[in-house]
């Protein structure tokens, strides 16, 4: 048994303008080469575009998009005997949000468009409506987990 203490789970800080943890998580994931001010700029421009497109609170659109993309279950490769099985595992809320943010950013990076703020705003609006690549990724993950429900006992 380890004598070391368990690490405290860090809570995400909130951003200066919206005072929201989700926005800060998004900023930290979009961050490249330590340029945090640029990441904030991209997020705030995307939020402004969401405000213009939907004429609703951009924070509620962001929450709805992340709630829509957050997976309940995922598959994890597990080697049993000589073969590798895709074992379905349940995902906690924090990990689910992190996955959702990663999928949203990945889908927006793949989108054709002028700049990242435009692409991110479009992806967030689509995800809030229930369409888009990030939603497709979640559904695909759920299908994989459902198909491999027979290997659930390998957990």
Swiss-Prot record:
It comes from Gunnera chilensis (Chilean rhubarb). Part of the 30S ribosomal subunit. GO terms for molecular function: rRNA binding; structural constituent of ribosome. It holds the Pfam family Ribosomal_S7. This is Small ribosomal subunit protein uS7c. InterPro entries: Ribosomal_uS7 (IPR000235), Ribosomal_uS7_bac/org-type (IPR005717), Ribosomal_uS7_CS (IPR020606), Ribosomal_uS7_dom (IPR023798), Ribosomal_uS7_dom_sf (IPR036823). It comes from the Eukaryota. Keywords: Chloroplast, Plastid, Ribonucleoprotein, Ribosomal protein, RNA-binding, rRNA-binding. It is found in: Plastid, Chloroplast. Transmembrane segments: none annotated. The keyword Methyltransferase does not apply. Coiled coil: none annotated. The keyword Methyltransferase does not apply. One of its GO terms (biological process) is translation. One of the primary rRNA binding proteins, it binds directly to 16S rRNA where it nucleates assembly of the head domain of the 30S subunit. Belongs to the universal ribosomal protein uS7 family.
